Amino acid sequence: MTQGNQKTEGNPPEQVTVTDKRRIDPETGEVRHVPPGDTPGGTAPQAATAESGGAATDKVAELTADLQRVQADFANYRKRALRDQQAAADRAKAAVVNQLLGVLDDLERARKHGDLESGPLKSVADKLESALTGLGLTAFGEEGEEFDPVLHEAVQHEGDGSKPVIGTVMRQGYKLGDQVLRHALVGVVDTVTEEGDGEAAATDEPTAAAAETRPPESDDNAGASGD
């Protein structure tokens, strides 16, 4: 034997230890549960994982809050844009209808003169008035209505103003929805209140009673008067 063989026979071979670090057991196919202390640095990775999980939760909450703010801002912007569009459409519609009020005045005068009782002009007037009514145009200002300074413009006034009502309508007013396009030109008079009627009746009754109870003139007085 050589010297090398002698050394090999004198020293027993070192045992090799193989650690199976596979998480799944190849024989059973189940996942192995290794305690944290059995693996080097097992506690530190868990702490790091917990910290990273908390940071991720905070980040998700922050992003969720940002998303909610963006959604609220967009909803407010959408409402504001729709409101502005509607206001612009209402202004444009009011401008067009306002240009046609003079035509309605001419048609009203023609109606009072009996020119719209029949014929093609009546058909045109009916179609125009129907179209404007469909857009929301309404007329106001009729005799007997209470005077409203918001809707009516008084050009003449009779009375002390205690109970003003419309006595004469010079020009009708028009509203488009809730917007006043033109005030009605009216003449205002005062109505007599019920109390005033009662006082007037009470004043007339004693006068009539006195006339009934007055004694007739005698014939002597009548003859003296004749002489």
Swiss-Prot record:
Skewed-composition ranges (Basic and acidic residues): 19-35
Region (Disordered): 1-57, 193-227
Gene that produces this protein: grpE
Subunit relationships: Homodimer.
Family the UniProt entry places it in: Belongs to the GrpE family.
InterPro entries hit by this protein: GrpE, GrpE_coiled_coil, GrpE_head
GO BP of this protein: protein folding
HAMAP family hit by this protein: GrpE
Keyword entries, A-Z: Chaperone, Cytoplasm, Stress response
Chain intervals with Polar residues compositional bias: 1-18
Species lineage: Bacteria, Bacillati, Actinomycetota, Actinomycetes, Mycobacteriales
Gene Ontology cellular component annotations, sorted alphabetically: cytoplasm
Name of the protein in its database record: Protein GrpE
Bias kind Low complexity: ranges: 41-50, 199-213
UniProt xrefs under PROSITE patterns: GRPE
SUPFAM superfamilies listed in its UniProt record: Coiled-coil domain of nucleotide exchange factor GrpE (SSF58014), Head domain of nucleotide exchange factor GrpE (SSF51064)
